[in-house]
Amino acid sequence: MTESGNGIVNTRQPKLFLDVPDMTSEAKKTYAELDVCTYTPKNLGDSKHEFMECDCFEEFRDGLNHACGEDSDCINRATLIECVNGLCKHSCGTDCQNQRFQKKAYADISVFKTERKGFGVRANSDIEPHNFIYEYIGEVIQEEEFRNRMVKYDQMGFKHFYFMMLQTGQFIDATLKGCIARFCNHSCNPNAYVNKWVVNGKLKMGIFANRHISKGEEVTFDYNVDRYGANAQPCYCEEPNCIGFLGGKTQTDAASLLPQSFADALGIRPSMEKKWINMMKAKGEKIAKSDTTTVNVDFVNSLSLEPCTKTEDVNRVMSVLLQIDDAFIAEKLLERITLTEDEAMHYQFIKLHGYLIFSRLITMFEDKPDIIWKILNFLLVLPKTTKNGIIHSGIDKKVEQLKNTPKFEVICEDLLEKWSKYETYTRISKKDISENSKVIDLRRIRLPIGWEIIHENGRPVYYNAQRQIKQANPPTDSAYRSNSSHNLSGVSDPKSRSATPSSNTSRYSGSVKYIPTPTYGQMQQKRTLSPEEYEKRKKSRIEWEQKELELRKLMEQETLKAKLDQETQKKSELERIIEEANKQKELERLQKLKQQQEDEERKKVKKQASHVNAIENKWVKFFAQHVPNLIKNYQKDVGKDVLKESARNIVKSLAQKELKKDSSRSPPEELSKEKRAKVKTFSMQYMDRLVAKMKEKKEKKR
């Protein structure tokens, strides 16, 4: 019985290859051996961020530095970064335990010849869960060269390709140059997984044990995540959950939907992937595998993310964010962070270079104000610590810049004011440890949540910034201890998401029953026939089962297609009805809008006319006070009635002249002398013309 990394117990005994000859020497003749990866150009594989020291201390015993070990709470180890001699001089010193890639601390493995898969890799001794097995070494190339080599190797007739995606646009090619890790075969139920570490400024890819691996057992991992080949190939892993094919552009049913480290960081369980894949199958939709990314965006978008509840959850999230350049995954991980309300987890976020990560996220999402707002809000709720991490990350300067944006001004001011009250301290050094080791070994103290060891007045002091407590002796508050309800010393241990072995029941309902592949022990018990006859019957049975499976799949596909066509037709009809209704609704809206605009225009014209008429009436009244007196002497010439009519005409003409000059101006309270003279002249000219016309008319009658 073996237990996988995700805690699932596999009752199927692993197959051992103890008596198969060692073929390592022969296998190495098929490629050029490399001790380290080569990079063309040299900047490929570079980490995008500067190296960060851990906060461990040297721990020499028996001539060996035990710092940063498997059971330590080393920040670098938890975030998949190796410590480097010369760069950790103020912390863990030289040759600590977190240098497995650099020291080539490989597991004892060898190459052997498999029955159907060519060469394979087996364990020469037991390997414990999450132990480092081997670095995947090869030529690191750009995407354009990767595509050229894919075509080239296919034309050369190569059956096996050895491409692994290191990061976006960069690939490790171990086809012609590499190491024996290239011979690790695929399995649908693997005992190892691939993870990426930052080692001395370069991103490295390593193979790690997913569960206990017994001596003689083949070492396998899932190709369907980071490994690339030209065409899909038959799978010969013989696992109960085998899907039949691996590689190619289209993912198979059990293909991983995103890299192991991303899945662990997002809190994705195997059942979640399986449920989504089954749902896609039911819809008759293929799960496409992109050439440019290892993340299935549709699957990730379908997830309902959960907050971090354990230290290892935080470790996984922060280790990915330290390396990631994928904004899509970064946004999803940020969502998981902001959902977390547990203060113990908040302290762990801060501890694992939290302020540095949030500083990078602000830069990554500088053109997305909604995400920036989320980051600032989360920073505001983080508990108080020392100011060292804030200053080192430079996040205070970025918040200062964001303050110039009106939307962020208030929250940035609140955040900067909060940080201004934090204190900066010199952390305890190795010299301080040496001087105080006679009294107490500071390296072995497991501090409660929120506590730090700082240097004050030449002596180590225990400090809790949130509670504003300093004391000379180690804190003993059990309610805040890291090893009580929350294990803050946990190290990120990626878990396997491979499907578990199926039970001996039919995989499908109906008349056709699928018989699972027998276990290795069952096959041993049935070998009463000769090997030749046994193999013949086995081949025949497999062929029959394959045909039955293909027939069943074909029937399922036809049923699903018919159902999908019917649903598509219903959907199209519904969309047509909705479209017609929307068109009618839009037409009514436009007509109503047009009517409103016409009504508004009429009101506007009427209002303007009303305003002009009011002003005109004021001018008429104004001139009516003066014109009759100016022309009263003409009554003897034209008569009383004609004089009144003439006065009205003169007043109206004068009012029209004023409106033409300015239709909004009202008349003055009094008529000025200059204006009176002009009005008098106009009025008398009008009357003189009228008198002349009347005299001319009388003379014609005579």
From Swiss-Prot:
Q: Which UniProt keywords apply?
A: Chromosome, Coiled coil, Methyltransferase, Nucleus, Repressor, S-adenosyl-L-methionine, Transcription, Transcription regulation, Transferase
Give the transmembrane ranges: none
What does the record give as the reaction this protein catalyses?
Answer: L-lysyl(36)-[histone H3] + 3 S-adenosyl-L-methionine = N(6),N(6),N(6)-trimethyl-L-lysyl(36)-[histone H3] + 3 S-adenosyl-L-homocysteine + 3 H(+)
Source organism's superkingdom? Eukaryota
Give me the Gene Ontology terms describing cellular component.
chromosome; nucleus
Tell me where in or outside the cell this protein is found: Nucleus; Chromosome
Annotated ranges, domain WW: 445-477
Q: What is its main location?
A: nucleus
EC no. given is: 2.1.1.359
Which parts of the chain are coiled coil?
554-611
Q: Which GO terms describe its molecular function?
A: histone H3K36 trimethyltransferase activity
Q: Where is the AWS domain?
A: 49-105
Which InterPro entries does this chain map to? Answer: AWS_dom, Post-SET_dom, Set2_fungi, SET2_Histone-Lys_MeTrsfase, SET_dom, SET_dom_sf, SETD2/Set2_SET, SRI
Spell out the CDD domains in the cross-references: SET_SETD2
Q: For the SET domain, which residue ranges apply?
A: 107-224
* Pfam families, per database record: AWS, SET, SRI, WW_1
Enumerate composition-biased segments (Basic and acidic residues). 529-541, 656-674
Segments of skewed composition (Polar residues) = 472-490, 497-509, 519-528
Query: How does the record comment on the protein's domains?
Result: The AWS and SET domains are necessary for transcription repression.
Functional description taken from the UniProt entry: Histone methyltransferase that trimethylates histone H3 'Lys-36' forming H3K36me3. Involved in transcription elongation as well as in transcription repression.
Mind telling me which PANTHER family this protein's record contains? Answer: SET DOMAIN PROTEINS
Q: Which family does it belong to?
A: Belongs to the class V-like SAM-binding methyltransferase superfamily. Histone-lysine methyltransferase family. SET2 subfamily.
Put simply, this protein is called: Histone-lysine N-methyltransferase, H3 lysine-36 specific
